Regions:
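Composition-driven low-complexity segments enriched in polar/acidic and proline residues
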Residues: 1-3, 65-66
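A generic beta-sheet turn/junction motif
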Residues: 4, 15, 69-71, 134
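Flexible, glycine-/basic-rich loop-and-beta segments that form/coincide
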Residues: 5, 17-21, 317-325
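Short, acidic/hydrophobic/Gly-rich beta-strand patch recurrent on exposed beta strands
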Residues: 10-13, 77-79, 207
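Internal alpha/beta scaffold segment
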Residues: 19-59, 82-108
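Short edge beta-strands and adjacent turn/loop segments
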Residues: 57-70
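Short, aliphatic-rich beta-strand segments
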Residues: 65, 72-81, 138-142, 243
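Rossmann-like S-adenosyl-L-methionine
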Residues: 87-93, 97-98, 102-325
Length: 325
């Protein structure tokens, strides 16, 4: 609530948790305003309290809205500090009238934390996912799964990763931090075999389903930390890779993972980065251990901000085996 007691939705002011009221951000889906206004109106009419971070009281913490750029499908997910939404049927009546809404659900987060999402999803109405296309690949997107928010630039980003991978149809590829298989399934169309690794179980469930939906049979997926799965597979099964693709979160790659990549000696490493500082750190390690940065491209995913996605192609050079023992 604002200082006058009115329920508001908006964004955090920079480096604070003070909310600036806003329901019609031009960067979001055009339906956001209608959805947020209906949620706020329902809360006021049904006396549903917004969450207060200071006291840990109140029910509605966040409203997650996702839209399929191609399919126009809309997901509305209320993040709640509890396990039950009062008078939820009245909320459904309001939201299902908005064109495109195909999925309404709740995410349970009862922890006193600033982490947005909890682990439990409660379906309320419609599907528990939406679908979208990137290129000619159809993806199922669940509320807990990572999916890029700028679909136009995402296609360019993944297209650049595919170009740098240099696939001819004979390669074995490992895609680390694969999410719902967005890059993996792009690569699988040109590779002999693709293996994806992701720590979030619902994302891997989506990845497997996405492979099935698209008739892609040369992609396998593993749940777990990339820095644990790949070293284990290499040490116990001596798995091979012609190309390794990494698309880590802002913290970059764990050194145990980088060490295994160097030991596996893929011909090419494609590094997709959302943080230039950790990219520089990881490139320093890889180039010190026999890899050469050959090509680099930046993709402006968030115009008018300081953030940029970077794609780097590294090729295998001479390696000092003493350094990687």
């Amino acid at each position: 609530r604002d200082k006058n007691g009115k329920i508001i939705a908006g964004f955090y002011a920079g480096r604070t948790h003070s909310i600036i009221a806003n329901t019609d951000c031009l960067l979001g889906a055009e339906e956001n305003e209608a959805i947020l206004n209906e949620v706020i109106s329902w809360m006021e009419v049904c006396k549903v309290e917004p969450y207060d971070e200071k006291t840990g009281k109140g029910l509605v913490r966040h409203v997650l809205i996702r839209k399929g750029f191609t399919t126009k499908e809309l997901m509305v997910c209320l993040v709640i500090n509890g396990r039950k939404i009062p008078q939820v049927e009245k909320l459904v009546d309001r939201l299902q009238k908005i064109e495109g809404v195909t999925a309404i659900m709740a995410n349970v987060n009862t922890e006193q934390t600033n982490v947005i999402l909890g682990k439990e999803i409660q379906p309320i109405w419609g599907q528990d996912y939406i679908e979208d296309y990137i290129g000619n690949v159809k993806y199922r997107i669940s509320p807990l799964s990572f999916y890029q928010v700028n679909p136009v630039q995402t296609e360019k980003l993944y297209g650049k990763a595919l170009e740098y991978a240099g696939l001819t149809g004979k390669e074995t590829v490992w895609d680390l931090y694969c999410g719902i298989g967005t890059i993996s399934l792009f690569l699988a169309q040109k590779a002999k075999q693709v293996y994806g690794v992701e720590i979030v179980p619902p994302a891997i469930a989506d990845a497997k389903d996405n492979a099935r939906r698209n008739g892609i049979q040369n992609a396998e997926f593993y749940v777990g930390k990339a820095e644990e799965i790949l070293p284990h597979k290499y040490e116990t099964e001596n798995v091979k890779a012609d190309v390794i693709v990494v698309d880590p979160p802002r913290k970059g790659c764990d050194e145990a993972l980088l060490e295994t990549i160097v030991k596996m000696q893929p011909e090419r490493v494609v590094y997709v980065s959302c943080d230039s500082a950790t990219l520089a750190r990881d490139l320093k390690y890889l180039t010190a251990n026999g890899y050469k940065a050959e090509r680099l491209a930046t993709v402006d995913m968030f115009p008018m901000t300081v953030h940029v996605e970077t794609v780097v192609l590294l090729s295998k050079g001479e390696v000092d085996s003493k350094k990687i023992r």
